[in-house]
Amino acid sequence: MHDEAVFNAIAGEEKRQREGLELIPSENYVSRAVREALGSVMTNKYSEGYPGARYYGGQTYTDVVEDLARERAKQLFNCQFVNVQPLSGAPANLELYAALLNPGDTVLGMDLSHGGHLTHGHPVTLPAKIYNFVRYKMKNPDTGEIDYDEMREVAKREKPKIVLAGFSAYSRELDYDAFVSIAREVGAFAVFDIAHIAGLIAGKAIRNPFDAGFDVMTTTTHKTLRGPRGGMILTREDADIAKKIDKSVFPGLQGGPHMNVIAAKAVAFGEALTPAFGTYAMQILKNAKAMEVVFAKEKVRMLGGGTSNHLILADVFGSLGVTGAEAEKVLDEVGITLNKNSIADDTRKPMDPSGIRFGTPAVTTRNFKEAECTRVAELMIHTLKHKDEEKVKLDVRAEIKALAEKFPIPESFV
């Protein structure tokens, strides 16, 4: 059967990706090899359990790919235990909580409005209905510095079982040692949700939290890691913690793992083990810095004062008088995709906030360097300053399309 409606939608999305530039920090392009594994016959197989201990027969090759994924992840992140079965980042976090906490236990995580993630305790989420979340914030949103003194006082007062690092809209590097120190002081697990920066860690562009003593890390396998959409939980060295996590994932919260996705994870982790991936990770940072320079020159306020990672959060409403939703829409019209985003202590509503969030993982995959990212940043600001001028938008759209044609999405990275 040829499903023309679905085929046309896929073809349209392929054209959109090919002719435009992707600046959403959590998005990236995967290789043809990853896509082939994702679309392979592994999708047909049920594999409840773990390698060597399955509840169904016929597991010879599924065990091979899961073992490959686990061993490659251990090499990438320098740890002893890995579970590659989580379906994505949010399930991985819930499974981590279920493994280490009892209902009502406390977690200390980053406030959503200061860069945290929904799964770090926002009241609308399931974890917040089961566990007690308390929050830390930035001392000064213009520098991005976390108030570690206040964080320590909150930890001493609230006695969390988990001290949680990690973010979805924070552009600076956290003080790993401070997190671990605070966790140790109150007898908590030190956990890092590295979903956004996993590829930067794997590529050795930034420090590995395990080297600072974190106990567990959760992550997605897409974003900067450039794999399929999925999740993973990594344990530094404690076998008892790893055993609890395995039981929490299966049978605790999941049934049969998606073996096609695990096969694709194994391929992506193999790609990330190559020297080329380290070069890629470093270039992500260089490209983000190049964009920071342009926004600073144009006096557009950036949360944290700039970036130390792959993303930038810009206050376009305060600096340019354009709301985040307006900016997202007009930039989409010229072929630049990013997302509207609330900023620290934003007075506007989440669907029409003051900020935009953008980053460099996907354009770096297309082999953009500093010069190209500088030009894209200039075009972004030019478009926002002239958002009601059709000729400006047409000219920018033509230049973006030409850039996309000059730097096509690669089929292979190694």
Residue map of PLM features:
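Conserved PLP-binding catalytic core of the aspartate aminotransferase-like
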Residues: R301-N367
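N-terminal glycine-rich, Lys/His-bearing helix-loop that initiates the first secondary-structure elements
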Residues: M1-L68, S181, A404-E405, I409-V414
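PLP-dependent enzyme catalytic core of the Aspartate aminotransferase-like
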Residues: H2-E4, K286-N287, P350-V414
